[in-house]
UniProtKB/Swiss-Prot annotation:
One of its GO terms (cellular component) is membrane. Residues 237-253 have a biased composition (Low complexity). It is a multi-pass membrane protein. This is Transmembrane protein 270. The chain crosses the membrane at residues 72-92, 130-150, 185-205. Keywords: Membrane, Transmembrane, Transmembrane helix. It holds the Pfam family WBS28. InterPro entries: WBS28.
Amino acid sequence: MEALPPVRSSLLGILLQVTRLSVLLVQNRDHLYNFLLLKINLFNHWVSGLAQEARGSCNWQAHLPLGAAACPLGQALWAGLALIQVPVWLVLQGPRLMWAGMWGSTKGLGLALLSAWEQLGLSVAIWTDLFLSCLHGLMLVALLLVVVTWRVCQKSHCFRLGRQLSKALQVNCVVRKLLVQLRRLYWWVETMTALTSWHLAYLITWTTCLASHLLQAAFEHTTQLAEAQEVEPQEVSGSSLLPSLSASSDSESGTVLPEQETPRE
């Protein structure tokens, strides 16, 4: 399906070129007619030359056209054509002559072999049967070679497919191993992050609790110190009152004792 746009573009280009050439031919039809007339004249001259060669006459000036004989350019053109005609004829007629010679030689060789076989007492039917048997054997050998090559190609294709499948399986195994390793790494990273996050949360909560306990203890200590500082002046005032009270009680007891001793005296 992907090769359709290039084919269409090439077809469009060919059609455009054909239309351009047709337009140019229509525009230059006079030159085309002159060229065709020249080709026809050259072909007629070549045919007449072949006829003259077949007859054994080489009188070129007798069969030249009147215009070519009068014009020096035409004479030079005909002279050049006469020089080129022999190699062109050899090129054109050489393969046909070679084929005719080969065919004649093979035909003569075949006739000579047939005459020799007939002289030896071997008929043509025997040789045809032998040739057909050899041909059948060659056909069987060719068929066997084709079958063997087809089987070898099939085996090689299967081997290539097996190698490709093994490579694909190896790649899949490697990919699976990599995926397993990546999964393990992911789980390890996830567990480590979870543990570190939980440890961090525990550490943060423990530090906050410790700080709160320390602050509470410091607050209680400060309150106790404040209460102690408030209680100390009261104790100092109470201790100062106790000696005065003891002194007053002693003085009262001293006054009472002499009064009690006087009657005894």
